């Protein structure tokens, strides 16, 4: 393949080498600071509609394997790398990154200065961008880019359309799919949970009819304020069933209890974000992927901040003062990234036990 252009909304143009699928795309450009884990990132549906830049200088060197998918159908718009490894060496490798992107109809660009690109995003914030093959009129592409309105139904696009089971012999968990990563299912499977995955717009009564022991609110893409039906569902189940929210689930849980959210300048996307547990001072290194956060302004009395990001002090976790419910902004399931916070799945199951014991004693 030949040359390919990356055109930013602010007018900046990068020229590089095309790889992956042969098509033009427009999306929100973001960056990920992880040194590995590109397969998990590309298949993470939280990147729905986004052009994903990897800051690490070499990507693709261990190929793509069958084990590390976070979704069967990746929904990111494009991939930007400094260097795409033309040869991949790993005993699990099934195909190269280039072959994988072609098979999933995702275009890529390599050979550009991703450090310079990342500095632009950090300074100006995330913005629209276009990946286009050389030869197209730049003026026409820029006009199209300016005129493009990015969709807001990201969660609707990636959520399952019908409920499905992930059988187990332990606790019954209803997992509300806002764009879930398969690693969340794997964490529950390790703990022998019987999981039912349901669409994002499932009602509170429909969830209660499944007789769950606990409810998990998954990660997902976009703006949490775009799914008001999820807020209504959360209000209808909290206090009746223990709740655990991750990433998008954290934001929705907070909104449902009267908090507000805001769009971050360039978000948290990487696997090395240090988070402090306020009560103990414990530091966990966490995997994160989000462009919105819960605001400290006017945080309702019902929510107690439990975790914060060390660098920017953004809220990384809350728990409800009166109900058996808590949430975190980061990914305790990792995939990719450190497993420092995987204990939160155990704490959720312990919360379920305590709730059921208290309920039985009344």
UniProtKB/Swiss-Prot annotation:
The keyword Nucleotide-binding applies. The active site is at residues 247, 331, 333. Residues 1-169 are annotated as: CPSase. L-glutamine binds at residues 46, 220, 222, 248, 251, 289, 291-292. It catalyses: hydrogencarbonate + L-glutamine + 2 ATP + H2O = carbamoyl phosphate + L-glutamate + 2 ADP + phosphate + 2 H(+). Its EC number is 6.3.5.5. One of its GO terms (biological process) is 'de novo' pyrimidine nucleobase biosynthetic process. Keywords: Amino-acid biosynthesis, Arginine biosynthesis, ATP-binding, Glutamine amidotransferase, Ligase, Nucleotide-binding, Pyrimidine biosynthesis. Pfam families: CPSase_sm_chain, GATase. Gene3D superfamilies: 3.40.50.880, Carbamoyl-phosphate synthase small subunit, N-terminal domain (3.50.30.20). Belongs to the CarA family. Small subunit of the glutamine-dependent carbamoyl phosphate synthetase (CPSase). CPSase catalyzes the formation of carbamoyl phosphate from the ammonia moiety of glutamine, carbonate, and phosphate donated by ATP, constituting the first step of 2 biosynthetic pathways, one leading to arginine and/or urea and the other to pyrimidine nucleotides. The small subunit (glutamine amidotransferase) binds and cleaves glutamine to supply the large subunit with the substrate ammonia. NCBIfam families: CPSaseIIsmall, PRK12838.1. Composed of two chains; the small (or glutamine) chain promotes the hydrolysis of glutamine to ammonia, which is used by the large (or ammonia) chain to synthesize carbamoyl phosphate. Tetramer of heterodimers (alpha,beta)4. This is Carbamoyl phosphate synthase small chain.
């Amino acid at each position: 393949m030949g040359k390919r252009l990356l055109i930013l909304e602010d007018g900046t143009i990068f020229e590089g080498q095309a790889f992956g699928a042969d098509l033009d795309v427009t999306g929100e450009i973001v960056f990920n600071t992880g040194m590995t884990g590109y397969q998990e990132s590309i298949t993470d549906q939280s990147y729905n509609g986004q052009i994903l830049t990897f800051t690490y200088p070499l990507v693709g060197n261990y190929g793509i394997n069958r084990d590390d998918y976070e979704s069967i159908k990746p929904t990111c718009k494009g991939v930007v790398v400094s260097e795409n490894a033309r040869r991949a060496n790993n005993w699990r490798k099934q195909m190269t990154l280039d072959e994988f992107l072609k098979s999933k109809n995702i275009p890529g660009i390599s050979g550009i200065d991703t450090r310079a690109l990342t500095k632009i995003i950090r300074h100006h914030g995330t913005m629209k961008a276009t990946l286009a093959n050389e030869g197209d009129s730049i003026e026409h592409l820029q006009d199209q880019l300016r005129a493009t309105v990015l969709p807001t139904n990201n969660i609707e696009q990636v959520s399952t359309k019908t409920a499905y089971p992930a059988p187990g012999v332990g606790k019954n968990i209803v997992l509300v799919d806002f764009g879930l990563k398969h690693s969340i299912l794997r964490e529950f499977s390790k703990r022998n949970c019987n999981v039912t995955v349901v669409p994002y717009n499932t009602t509170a009564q429909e969830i209660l009819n499944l007789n769950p022991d606990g409810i998990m609110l998954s990660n997902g893409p976009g703006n949490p304020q775009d799914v008001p039906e999820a807020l209504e569902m959360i209000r209808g189940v909290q206090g009746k069933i223990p709740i655990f929210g991750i990433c998008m689930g954290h934001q929705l849980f907070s909104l449902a209890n009267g908090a507000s959210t805001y769009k971050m300048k360039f978000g948290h996307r990487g696997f090395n974000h240090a988070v402090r547990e306020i009560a103990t001072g414990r530091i966990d290194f966490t995997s994160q992927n989000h462009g919105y956060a819960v605001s400290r302004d006017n945080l309702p009395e019902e929510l107690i901040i439990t975790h914060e990001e060390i660098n920017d002090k953004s809220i990384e976790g809350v728990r409800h003062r009166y109900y058996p419910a808590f949430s975190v902004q980061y990914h305790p399931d990792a995939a990719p990234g450190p497993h420092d916070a995987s204990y939160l799945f155990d704490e959720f199951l312990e919360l379920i036990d305590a709730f059921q014991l208290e309920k039985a004693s009344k």
